[in-house]
Amino acid sequence: MNIHAYFQSFTLFAAALSSVAQNPTFPTGNPHSGEAFFKVDFPNVHGNGRSCATCHVPEEAFQLTPQHVEARYQALAQRRLTDPSADDPLFRSIDANDFADDFTNLRNHALVRVSITLPTDAAGQKLMWPVNDPTATVVAVWRSTPTVWNSAFTAPYQLDGRQPTLQAQALGALVAHSEITRDPKERFLDDVAAFQRAQFSSPAVENLSAALASGAPPPPTDPLLNIEEQRGKLLFNQHCATCHGGPTQTVPLTRLPPGIRNIRISKPVPPAGADLPFAPSPIAPRLWAFRVPGQAAPEVRSSTDPGQALLTGNIAHLNFFDIPTLYGISRTAPYFHDNSAATLEDVVRHYQVDAIFVRRVAPVGAPRPDLILDDEIPPLVAYLKKI
């Protein structure tokens, strides 16, 4: 398969995906049937052998890690020494760097290819496009596979928030990653969604979800905290709750577009003068052109992944991504949409450096984030590991 054939096959099912996304429902579904559907191949929809669990690995907190991918790659290589036809559905050409057998991004970073149709205005004119391919109607970016834990209260879904329901999310994955050639039955999607809604990072978070669903006051979710962790919670409320606010830790407390943020991850190099403590994005940057009202010439920006801008075409949404809940985060490394932070310490240090950068470039009078001090990092990380 080449890139043109890939984009053509993706476009064929865009209408079906759009129909589910635009008509969201929240039926009960059967989580027991959904578990079976989640974990096995889908024989009735003629896919490529992948199930949901191929990438959302139950034993790996329902996500995909570089270590897991590499172990499977090496195991497959060993099997092929005696059986050249041995197969693992994780390794499909759609997620190869060269659409053949180079799985560098998948093996080294657990990143999969995600295709998105470029946004257009009412007249059908594209609002943005890659500078090196102005005729493109669909583009691909490389992203991590997030956990399904706590998805009962984290809508919208996907790293850019493009799917309003778990049914739409499941169908999108079937189309893009399992390459189905037949539409699944609606009940199938309802059951898979029901199974996902039943997965939580802890019993306390499950109780929180039930309370939110019933309209009851949210119960406390913190386990017993020691003195360091208690200090970390205070620091969390000071530094992190601005975006990770509310009982679900997904409600921003600032006057910005709800649910999305630019945390300056979609850059291949650190901001000028910064020294990031973890590897920059493994993905090469591209130049993107944006149509801006009132301007004759397009604005051009560099990004490894434009995030929500790929949905809206709005340059103001460049590099914006959905705000995830942080419950269970100690078990879902690596972090960010490109898996560029290996540890929670790396994540916190990124925000430490990012705050310095924002304070330096913020216009006069604009709000400036508090700086995270070096001695605040251990207690903050200790609290994050406990929730």
Residues of each region from the PLM?
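Periplasmic c-type cytochrome electron-transfer domains
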Residues: A21-I387
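Bacterial N-terminal signal peptides
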Residues: Q8-S18
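N-terminal secretory signal peptides that target proteins for export/translocation
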Residues: M1-A5
